[in-house]
Amino acid sequence: MALRVLFFATGLLTSSSLAAAPDLTGIWTLNGPGTESEILLTEEGLRIQSEYDLLVDDPSLFCVPASASRIWANPGARILIQQSEEAVLISYELFDLRRDIPIGDESAMTDMPSTKNIDGTYFQEMGSSFAGYVDERLIIESRNHSLGYIRTSRGIPQSRNTVTNEVLRIEGDTLHLTHTYFDDTLYENPIVMDYFFRRTDESEITLYECREANYDWFNELNAPKEEETQ
């Protein structure tokens, strides 16, 4: 729980902490697959995973973000970060998501999800968040998640008990994100994921305009050939 202890030990994080703020403003894209710690699920986590069917239950099929981790880790999708004294706005090209995170302590967090799409639909899968700056890092804490999946390919779940920390820092020309998931009901140990992003020269992100999809292409690809059935 080191990241959570670090966050709360800083006390009230107000706009005055901007003096310690890294310059995250700009458009970023994922640079490589990233890394993750060993994932050990509890009995409840394994139960949820065993009932997950990628071809049916993947929220992306319905233009719904499965989790913040899933959105950060989407290859090729641009991410716009904007900073002000009161908030950090993260605009994800994927699903046209807009994540408005207040700067402050826990009292700055509302019961509403911090993320909605450009049509005004809110997504509890992304949680409710608040943030602050510590030692040239942006630290985001999120709670109040709904059921979702931090790894849709493997059905690694999150729940309403899940708490997450996102620590963003600049290293040279690279944005480094350490994303940690805490949930004693699902994980034997916190799950830690590291991602790296490169800053682009682009000035805006394009509309994604998601439409509901399916995995028919996958089923067709893996269907037995006619000669194999004869």
What does each of the following model-derived ranges do?
Residues 14-17:
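N-terminal signal peptide c-region/cleavage motif recognized by signal peptidases
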